[in-house]
Amino acid sequence: MYYDTIVVGGSIAGLLTAREVSSKGFSVLVIEEDYEIGTPEHCGGLVSIAGLEELGIIPSKKTFDHMIESAKITSPNGENFTINSKNQKVIEISRRELDKQVAFQAQKNGAIIKVRTSFQEITKTGIRTNEEEIDCKIFVDARGVSSLIHKDRTGILSSAQYEIYADWIKKGKVEVIFDQEKYPGFFAWIIPSDEGKGKVGIAGKGVNVSDTLNEFLKQKGEFSTIRKIFAPIWIKGPIKRFVEGNTVIVGDAAGQAKPTTAGGIFTSGMGGVYAGQAIAAFLKTNEREELDNYQKKWTERFGKEFEKQLLARKILERMDNQTINKLFETITPDIINEISEKDDFDFHTSSIIKLLGIKGSLKTAQTLVSGELKKILG
C-alpha cells in the first residue's frame, strides 16, 4: 500500500497537515494510536477566535464552549488582580471536538484516518505500524511531546490536569496561580468549561504533579473529579530542524508550543498548515526547497515572539516567591488596563512582562537577569 504522505498523530497539527496536503489531491493517511481522535485531551483549550479563523476553523456548537471574560492572576502570598480579557476574544473550546472537526475537514478532502494504529518505525520505503508496512514519500511526525523525550528531557515538565465539577469554578473566569515552591518554573490554572465545571491543572519542575494537584484542589473546596490527564509539556521552544530528509515534524513534536504557557493550538496549528502547504508543493514539483519553506514561514511568523518568551521563562525560573511577591506589588491599575485593552492573545510577551511587574520595577529585575531583561524589553 502507498500514500503520498503518512501523518503519525491525529491531533490538531497533524490533522491540519493532512487537510492541506489532501486539499491538493494527494493521498494522505493519518494514523492515531488512541481509540478516538481528540483523546487524551490534555490541552487547556484556550484559543482566540482570530487564531481559529486563520487556521480555517469556524468552531461548531459542539466545539465552542464559551467566551473567556477575565483572568485572575494570584501571587504566592495570595495577592491578586484581574485582567479583563473581552478585547482578546478568547474562547474555551473542547479539544476533542476541535480535533474531530479538523479530522472531518481532512477526510472530506480525501484523507484516510485510522485509530488504534500505532507507529513502530521508519522503513526504507515508508513506515511499519502494528498492523502492516506502508510505503510513502513523506512521513509527518505529529506524535507530540513523546517524540521529544529521547532528544532533550531538559525542556520537559510534568503536568496534571483534572476535569472537575465544583461550585467555585465560575464560567468565563480563568485563574492563574504562581508559586515557585509548589509549581517551580510554571503555575497552577483553572479554566472553566461552564458554570461549576472546568479543567484544573498544575505543572512544575521536579514535582509530584498528582500529589501537588490534589493538595491544590483540597485547599480550594469541594469538587468531583470526572477525568484525570497526566502528560509531559514542552517549554523549550522550537527544535533546530523541522525537516529531516523525508520526515517533516509538526506541532508539539517540533517544539511549536509556547514556552511561557505550553499552549499551542494556534502556533502548532499554523505549523501544520505551513507544513501541509510545503509538502503539497514538494509533491507537485519534487523541489526540496519547497519543504524548507515550511520552517522558514513558521520562523518568520513566530520566531521572534518565541525567543522573547524563552527569555521571559528564564526570568521566571530565576525568581523566588519573595521576588514575585515584590514585583506583583508594583503592578498598577494602568498596567492592568493596558493589558486588558490589548486585542492579541497569541503574541503576548509584552503582557507577560507587565504581569510580572518588570517594567514597573526595572531596577529589581535588572539585578536578577541583567542583559536578558534588556533583550526581552528591546
Give the label of every model feature segment:
Residues 50-101:
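A conserved beta-strand/loop capping segment in the N-terminal third of enzymes
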Residues 13, 36, 146:
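Conserved Rossmann-like nucleotide-cofactor binding loop
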Residues 5, 26-28, 139, 174:
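Hydrophobic anchor at the start of a short beta-strand
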Residues 10, 105-225, 239, 255:
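Predominantly flavin-linked oxidoreductase catalytic cores and closely associated redox partners
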Residues 206-284, 293:
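FAD/FMN-dependent oxidoreductases across multiple families
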